């Protein structure tokens, strides 16, 4: 699939983060939102009106839409594998919001199905370049913590401000 500019995308999964990404798409000028889908008819219509795109009646309609070259997937994490696999099999490139999946196994399946389909899979891990993450990576690489076998982190922030 040849990609032209602007790249025509469909947004799937409507929530506050889909609006944040859609606003960024509009500012970029490199992408154009042409369709959207979420299970809620009301949310679809509101999003379509706000961003000037078509409200698709089903996810399958998005995937068979020849104008749609890629999807922005902000669906719940537990359906990332199913929604991404369907998009890849339809030849659509994918921007997938983090985390890739709820399990390593599903994450591997997602990357494999995109690889097999020959589509681009882009992940929305926006924090990896922040200074405190680079600092902790240097500490890990320097062996400060010994042999690292597991790590867990929680980032909390006040979204109401």
Which residues does each PLM region occupy?
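N-terminal Rossmann-like dinucleotide-binding module
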Residues: 1-51
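Short, Asp-centered acidic motifs that coordinate Mg2+ and/or phosphate
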Residues: 35, 69-70, 150
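A contiguous active-site-proximal alpha/beta segment in oxidoreductase catalytic domains
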Residues: 101-161
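Structural detector of well-ordered beta-strand residues that form the stable sheet scaffold
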Residues: 34, 56, 95, 120-122, ...
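Short, conserved SAM-binding/catalytic segment
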Residues: 46-53, 113-117
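Glycine-rich, N-terminal phosphate-binding loop of Rossmann-like dinucleotide-binding domains
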Residues: 14, 74-75, 155
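Beta-loop-alpha module in the N-terminal Rossmann-like domain of NAD(P)-dependent dehydrogenases
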Residues: 53-113
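A broad helix-preferring feature
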Residues: 13-21, 63-71, 117-119
């Amino acid at each position: 699939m040849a990609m032209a500019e602007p790249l025509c995308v469909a947004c799937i999964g409507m929530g506050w983060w889909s609006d944040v990404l859609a606003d960024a798409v509009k500012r970029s000028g490199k992408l154009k939102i042409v369709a959207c889908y979420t299970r809620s008819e009301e949310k679809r219509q509101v999003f379509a009106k706000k961003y000037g795109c078509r409200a698709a009646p089903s996810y399958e309609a998005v995937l068979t839409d020849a104008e749609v070259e890629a999807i922005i997937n902000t669906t719940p994490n537990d359906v990332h594998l199913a929604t991404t696999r369907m998009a890849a099999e339809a030849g659509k490139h994918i921007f997938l919001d983090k985390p890739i999946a709820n399990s390593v196994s599903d994450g591997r399946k997602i990357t494999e199905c995109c690889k097999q389909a020959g589509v681009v899979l882009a992940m929305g891990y926006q924090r990896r370049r922040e200074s405190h993450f680079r600092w902790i990576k240097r500490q890990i690489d320097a062996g400060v913590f010994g042999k690292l076998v597991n790590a867990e982190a929680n980032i909390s922030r006040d979204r109401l401000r």
